[in-house]
UniProtKB/Swiss-Prot annotation:
Protein name: Keratin, type I cuticular Ha7
InterPro entries: IF_conserved (IPR018039), IF_rod_dom (IPR039008), Keratin_I (IPR002957)
Annotated Gene Ontology cellular component terms: cytoskeleton; cytosol; extracellular exosome; intermediate filament
Keywords, comma-separated and alphabetical: Coiled coil, Intermediate filament, Keratin
Residue ranges of the region described as Linker 1: 140-150
Spans annotated as Head: 1-104
Signal peptide span: none
Start and end residues of each stretch annotated as Tail: 416-449
All residue ranges annotated as the IF rod domain in the record: 104-415
Region of interest (Coil 2), ranges: 268-411
Extra remark: There are two types of hair/microfibrillar keratin, I (acidic) and II (neutral to basic).
Length: 449
């Protein structure tokens, strides 16, 4: 793209404003007007148009020149007093008479090349836009793939570990229950041992009491036997004394007196003693039987009382054991329920933490995706604006091309000769005057539009 700024002044007094871009459009020979029309117009049409409308002719709205002329278009007009306009510009005044040089085809070719370059530029930008969209889609997919990696294996590992932890907790709970059951069984056996010890002590006490009674009975029997022996000895002593007394009396009396008395026969002492002995033996036997019966009755009563007490004690102990077992079972169940409650609370806390973390990750991912979406929308809006700008540029360039073509066609009809072919024919180019059907400013306005 080639353009330059010109601040040279025209001999007629019109000065190009600094910054006004003088773009040479076509390599058409300058047609200088006759000397009589030199005071009417001496300025180039395109320069007047650019200077009057303050429009950068041939430039894009982006501030870049869109016209690149061949080197032949930069040769100055050899006529003295001209506006320093290149000599191959085909329009030098508004009153030319169908005069065109031999560069018309080159100019049209240049304009066509310019249009082709612009269309190529548009196609290139569209292709770049499509490539950018493809790149954005790929990057969004890659970003999704990087932002959302596959955590399924980790999740499976975590689930397996959680299952193992739950199994371990259940095994621990089962072992705790077994330990509690063993403790309860040990307590039961300890209670049974204590009850057996108490029963053994009771039996030992009963045995001691019975042994004491038996000893008392044995002592009573020994006393009775001693009394019996003493009575027997007394009987024997009495008998021996009686016999001795009888012998003494017989010895004292001798045979002096023989007195016969008609008396009843004497009582048989042996028989009497035998009867007494039998009576005493019967009494001893009766007393012994009575003592034995009393001892048996007392023993049976005490044993029955002990048995009833032991039965009542066993019933109470069995009830106590049942109640203790029930209490222990309820305590174990309560502990198991507490353990289950703690496990469920821990699982709930872990699930809440895990889902809270996942929710935070999802929210961060959503925020990232929303930011990316906003960036993509901003990029799309920017590209759409650039595309609209390019479409506007395209429309303006097409309008410029149409304007240039109309100008070329009108000047082709208006310039009949080339008075600038010889240096001596004219000394200066007349100023551009009014033309039928419009002015250069009007053309500039149409170009600006």
């Amino acid at each position: 793209m080639t353009s330059f700024y010109s601040t040279s002044s025209c001999p007629l007094g019109c000065t190009m404003a600094p910054g006004a871009r003088n773009v040479f459009v076509s390599p058409i020979d300058v047609g200088c007007q006759p000397v009589a029309e030199a005071n009417a117009a001496s300025m180039c049409l395109l320069a007047n148009v650019a200077h009057a409308n303050r429009v950068r002719v041939g430039s894009t709205p982006l501030g870049r020149p869109s016209l690149c002329l061949p080197p032949t278009s930069h040769t100055a007009c050899p006529l003295p007093g001209t506006c320093h306009i290149p000599g191959n510009i085909g329009i030098c005044g508004a009153y030319g008479k169908n005069t065109l040089n031999g560069h018309e085809k080159e100019t049209m070719k240049f304009l066509n090349d310019r249009l082709a370059n612009y269309l190529e530029k548009v196609r290139q930008l569209e292709q770049e836009n499509a490539e950018l969209e493809t790149t954005l889609l790929e990057r969004s997919k890659c970003h999704e793939s990087t932002v959302c990696p596959d955590y399924q294996s980790y999740f499976r590992t975590i689930e397996e570990l959680q299952q193992k932890i739950l199994c371990s907790k259940a095994e621990n709970a089962r072992l705790i229950v077994q330990i509690d059951n063993a403790k309860l069984a040990a307590d039961d056996f300890r209670i049974k041992l204590e009850s057996e010890r108490s029963l053994h002590q009771l039996v030992e006490a009963d045995k001691c009491g019975t042994q004491k009674l038996l000893d008392d009975a044995t002592l009573a029997k020994a006393d009775l036997e001693a009394q019996q022996e003493s009575l027997k000895e007394e009987q024997l002593s009495l008998k021996s004394n009686h016999e001795q007394e009888v012998k003494i009396l017989r010895s004292q009396l001798g045979e002096k007196f023989r007195i016969e008395l008609d008396i009843e026969p004497t009582i048989d002492l042996n028989r009497v003693l035998g009867e007494m002995r039998a009576q005493y033996e019967a009494m001893v036997e009766t007393n012994h039987q009575d003592v034995e019966q009393w001892f048996q009755a007392q023993s049976e009563g005490i044993s029955l009382q002990a048995m009833s007490c032991s039965e009542e004690l066993q019933c109470c102990q069995s009830e106590i054991l049942e109640l203790r077992c029930t209490v222990n079972a309820l305590e174990v169940e309560r502990q198991a329920q507490h353990t289950l409650k703690d496990c469920l609370q821990n699982s709930l806390c872990e699930a809440e933490d895990r889902y809270g973390t996942e929710l935070a990750q999802m929210q961060s991912l959503i925020s990232n995706l929303e930011e990316q979406l906003s960036e993509i929308r901003a990029d799309l809006e920017r590209q759409n604006q650039e595309y609209q700008v390019l479409l506007d540029v395209k429309a303006r360039l097409e309008n410029e091309i149409a304007t240039y073509r109309n100008l070329l066609e009108s000047e082709d009809c208006k310039l009949p000769c080339n008075p600038c072919s010889t240096p001596a024919s004219c000394t200066s180019c007349p100023s551009c005057g009014p033309v039928t059907g419009g002015s250069p400013s009007g053309h500039g306005a149409s170009m600006g539009r």
